[in-house]
């Protein structure tokens, strides 16, 4: 359940949402086959961008958090509530439809246990208004970039993708992490016969 808004103009676009990302599972622990419990997870986010297909930039933000009151006390003792803040940028730059660079990078600040003690010293306190760092928090990065060349007689591209270990986004159901995609290169040569 949720609500979303979207605006699109010729080059400018913006979107926002708020809603339930995951429903709570609160089965009776005396049940012989209870399902795995889970907190109700709320999320909100927005994105804004400018540009067309050839040259564009978009910024997006996602905030997700578990509602502790959505789970019975007996389950709360076994399962930690979590929260997450993701900030990302994606863009594309091209030159005369011959050379193009695309990139998508994101930073994820993830807390595995919202009830863990707060970090009160160092650089982590600078961001308290945006994300409250706890002793179970971690910040990780993920991204990819691709460079493509298109000429009448050859098409070539090179790509790099990296996801740091323990990268987590509560806005996705599954994320591969600790992943380095080593620069594959694709080349296609066009040959004309007369």
What does each of the following model-derived ranges do?
Residues 2-194:
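Signature for the C-terminal beta-barrel architecture of outer-membrane proteins
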């Amino acid at each position: 359940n949720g609500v979303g808004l979207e605006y699109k103009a010729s080059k400018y676009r913006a979107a926002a949402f708020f809603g339930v990302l995951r429903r709570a599972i609160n089965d009776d622990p005396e049940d012989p086959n209870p399902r795995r419990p889970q907190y109700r997870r709320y999320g909100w986010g927005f994105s804004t961008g400018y540009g067309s297909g050839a040259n564009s930039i978009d910024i997006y933000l996602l905030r997700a958090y578990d509602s502790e009151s959505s789970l019975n006390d007996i389950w709360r003792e076994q399962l930690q509530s979590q929260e997450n803040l993701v900030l990302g940028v994606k863009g594309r730059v091209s030159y005369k439809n011959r050379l193009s660079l695309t990139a998508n990078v994101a930073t994820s600040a993830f807390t595995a246990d919202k009830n863990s003690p707060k970090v009160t010293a160092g650089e982590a306190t600078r961001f308290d208004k945006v994300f409250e760092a706890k002793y179970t928090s971690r910040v990780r990065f993920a991204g990819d970039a691709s460079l493509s060349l298109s000429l009448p007689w050859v098409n070539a591209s090179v790509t790099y993708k990296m996801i740091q270990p323990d990268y987590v986004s509560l806005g996705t159901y599954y994320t591969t992490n600790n992943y380095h995609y080593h620069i594959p290169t694709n080349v296609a040569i066009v040959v004309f016969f007369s």
